[in-house]
Amino acid sequence: MEELQGYLEKDRSRQQPLLYPLLFQEYIYALAHDRGLKGSLFYEPTEVFGYDSKFSLALVKRLIIRIYQQNFFLSVVNDSNKNRFVSHHHNNFCYSHFYSQMISEGFAILVEIPFSLRLVSYFEKKEIPKSHNLRSIHSFFPFLEDKLLHSDYVSDIIIPHPIHMEILVQILQCWIQDVPLLHFLRFFLHKYHNWNSFLITPKKSIYVFSKENKRLFRFLYNSYVSECEFLLVFLRKQSSYLRLTSFGTFLERRHFYVKMEHLQMQHLILIVVCRDYFQGTLWSFKDPFMHYVRCQGKAVLASKGTHFLMKKWKYNFVNLWQYYFHFWYQSYRIHINQLSNYSFYFMGYLSSLLKNSSTVRNQMLENSFLIDTVTNKFETIVPVIFLIGSLSKAQFCTVSGHPISKPIWADLSDSEIIERFGRMCRNLSHYHSGSSKKQGLYRIKYILRLSCARTLAGKHKSTVRTFLRRLGSGLLEEFFTEEEQVLSLILPKTIPFTFYGSKKERIWYLDIIRINDXVNHE
């Protein structure tokens, strides 16, 4: 436990700025309004009472004060339920919801400040050029190929959520010492949860929160996942044969500036509570060939060990969530499969490990004999069914893949319609260009091309054949031109940092800027 205590110890020498006073600064909400609210659900209703693209700092301050009042949220809910379609009460509901969302976006910007400052200072100190952080999206797959070729078993893991709101606040206490700000976050989350319990079912509460408060939800979710992964790093260190050797781990950094390398001492209490569990299992398995990678809420765990060893890691994950995060997670939700006969869906690809056998004749003097060799090949395939399902939800085709028109774009100009379809096609083509079999990708291009033609034909009340004849090669050129700005990810070189009482470890930060956002063009 002494080693765990040193691992979790936080560097208290860093001074953090007080963030709570910034909640009352107008430029914070201007930034939140410009970056986060223009495309939100509650942006349009504000035009009814004349705000349009404006807002009032005085109203934001007034709302913060009213949030602390005991009956504020309850009165808003009662007004909205009794008189939802009455002008005055409807405006009051939209007004309150709009500014509550603005506070959420402003708060998310504030809590990102300490992490952004530390990240910028790190790159300035190390003199790392920004261009060195940019890599092609396909740099990720050679890493998988290099590691999984020597693995035998793989597990698909869905990161569980939501956890209790108080746990989220406690996690942030490790990194932010601004007590008023954390108190306001706790109060806001508690009131928001109670408010929505009147309007929606508890099962949909986290879904609504993630949709209406995207930036804050991503920050809280990433802080929670970061906590899970740093404990995983600790367990991985304990289970290695070579205790002081370095290893690589991918940590996602999407809408979140940096994953901190230290954890707070307060969390040691939770570890001590379940000390018997950790002490009983930390030394019961040794696996120097464990590889873990995650994108958003899905993770893949691969190992060269036995099936029994994978079950050890499986129950290690389950107990971590149950005893440390107080989240009940069923073990059957983590599947263990043999990599040689299993395909897993990850980062938009169906990946599998194929075995290729070959026979070589070897001649030695007068004797000759045949040598059979088996090599592993990491194969990535375009998931046509999943892509057709996404296009079907976005109303570009039917469930069976039959192209249909997009009438919602009929008000746009012809060039804008073609440009949108072409951009989608180029993005998909670039992202899936690393596939070993591209027949499925050609089918997706055909669906988008014909859907574009049907949209234009419906707009001009003509036939598809007429427009294909009229545009012909021009339409084809638009759909098969390479994308000018390629998808990229921030993948810096291994970044060393020092844990308390240990040698340098290496963490790889993976930041996916965008993944074929085919359905987000409305």
Curated annotation (Swiss-Prot):
CC annotations in GO: chloroplast
Pfam families per record: Intron_maturas2, MatK_N
Record key words, sorted: Chloroplast, mRNA processing, Plastid, RNA-binding, tRNA processing
Superkingdom of origin organism: Eukaryota
Main localization (coarse): plastid
Alphabetized GO MF terms: RNA binding
Record function comment: Usually encoded in the trnK tRNA gene intron. Probably assists in splicing its own and other chloroplast group II introns.
Family (UniProt): Belongs to the intron maturase 2 family. MatK subfamily.
UniProt-listed PANTHER family: MATURASE K (PTHR34811:SF1)
HAMAP family, sorted: MatK
Stated name of the protein: Maturase K
Gene: matK
